[in-house]
UniProtKB/Swiss-Prot annotation:
Assembly: Forms a ternary complex with MCM helicase and DNA. Component of the archaeal exosome complex.
Protein encoded by which gene: dnaG
Protein name, entry field: DNA primase DnaG
Cofactor: how and how many bound: Binds two Mg(2+) per subunit.
GO BP field: DNA replication, synthesis of primer
Cofactors demanded by this protein: Mg(2+)
Domain Toprim per the UniProt entry, residue ranges: 166-241
Length: 424
């Protein structure tokens, strides 16, 4: 963009063309101040731009306007303007050129910027200033404890996060729900005082990881036994002995949930102490886990020794999905045991070497950062979701082994999905 625009008026005592005027300017200024300041040389070096000529014929004369862009400094631009004024003939006719103005393009641009800034400032000042009352009201709403909702056909007291979360916390009554909501636990639902486990709870337990959080008294023991006989329970948390969930502080709630024990571990400990009912409940829980896992039941072989490669027969032509047999090293079972209750995942390469161990909540984002084919398998103490399957398919993951399988709308045929119960 040029720094200056030389604006001049031209008058010729005869009828001439535009190129005649331009030729006269170049011809009559050539060599006046040496080759370095010749107009053609300056134009070749982009120091001045193309000369624009606008003319019209009036009473046998040619009159018009010249515009010459200049990238020279102020002194040199003024000299070029004076050189142009020195032209006194165009062809056989007398001519007069007079510089009318030299426009500083940068100043014009600055002026436009200032004008626009003033306009923006006026528009900005018209906007409504923030109302402190509205701000305080928004802050108050943010701190407001959400009210329990009525969930399912049985109208069970529940928090607003039950549907969105992949884990639910089952408590006894409405007061327990209110107390957990007060401290930010929104994925909580109550049994609602029912003698039997409501169907809503049964259905949720088939799709989500379940944490049972009950009072530390005999009543809590009875409710826990009923739940263990009816639904798949993943973790068991209890209030301190003699205390109720509804009276716990936020710190006590977090501490109790952080100490939640995997159901298998809880029952095995009681069974070792000779508790026959615990042995029975352990068998019930294993059966319930298998029933949930049968949503997707592939063939799997856990190898006791180093696998020997065998030719894989071509799959039969059928509309049904065919899942091929897969060899999993025995040590992966130890990795699964180490994952129980941690809510963590381990990524493996094609040789079943551990690539990374990370929290389940970071799994999708971590996969997103990895290149394709970097991860062959994922073992995770969590629930397999459609979002995870979609990302795993994108990254060419071949296998996912998890504690539980959530609601899946589509499973790519190239991904094998297993639960811990399939392996253990």
């Amino acid at each position: 963009m040029a720094k200056y625009l030389i604006n001049a008026r031209v008058e010729v005592d005869g009828v001439v063309e535009k190129h005649d005027i331009i030729g006269a300017i170049f011809g009559q200024t050539e060599g006046l101040f040496g080759e370095q300041f010749d107009l053609r040389t300056l134009q070749d070096k982009n120091r001045i731009g193309r000369i624009q000529v606008m003319t019209k014929i009036h009473n046998g004369k040619t009159i018009g306007e010249l515009i010459i862009p200049s990238n020279l400094d102020r002194l040199e631009t003024a000299l070029v303007a004076a050189m142009i004024e020195s032209v006194d003939r165009v062809g056989p006719y007398s001519a007069r050129i007079e510089v009318v103005d030299i426009i500083d393009v940068r100043l014009e641009k600055i002026k436009k910027i200032i004008d626009r800034a003033i306009e923006i400032l006026h528009e900005w000042s018209k906007e409504k200033a923030p109302d402190i009352k509205e701000i305080l009201k928004e802050m108050q709403e943010a701190l407001k404890v959400p009210e329990p909702q009525k969930y399912g056909p049985e109208q069970l007291p529940a928090g607003p996060g039950v549907d969105e979360s992949d884990t639910i916390i089952i408590v006894e009554g409405r007061a327990d729900v209110i107390n957990l909501l007060r401290y930010g636990f929104t994925n909580v639902i109550a049994l609602g005082g029912a003698r039997k486990v409501p169907n809503t709870i049964k259905n949720l337990a088939k799709k989500k990881k379940v944490i049972v959080f009950l009072d530390g008294d005999h009543g809590g023991d009875l409710i826990l036994k009923e739940l263990l006989r009816t639904i798949k329970v993943d973790f068991i948390a209890r209030a301190p002995e003699g205390r109720e969930v509804e009276e716990l502080t936020g710190k006590e709630i977090r501490e109790a949930l952080s100490k939640a024990v995997p159901t298998r571990e809880y029952l095995e400990k009681l069974a070792k102490q000779g508790n026959k009912e615990a042995q029975y409940l352990l068998q019930v829980q294993e059966r319930l886990a298998r029933e949930v896992a049968e949503q997707i039941k592939p063939q799997v072989k856990v190898e006791e020794k180093k696998p020997v490669e065998k030719p894989v027969p071509k799959p039969p032509k059928t509309v049904e999905e065919v899942v091929e047999a897969v060899s999993i090293p025995l040590r992966i079972r130890e990795d699964i045991k180490s994952l129980y209750g941690t809510l963590e995942a381990i990524l493996y390469d094609n040789e079943w070497n551990s690539v990374k161990r990370l929290p389940v909540r970071d799994l999708v984002n971590t996969l997103d950062e990895l290149d394709e084919n970097n991860v062959q398998a994922i073992v995770m103490d969590g629930i397999i979701t459609q979002r995870l399957i979609d990302k795993a398919s994108e990254k060419k993951v071949k296998m996912i082994i998890a504690a539980k399988i959530g609601r899946i709308n589509y499973k790519p045929p190239e991904i094998l999905i297993l639960t811990f119960n399939d392996i253990m």
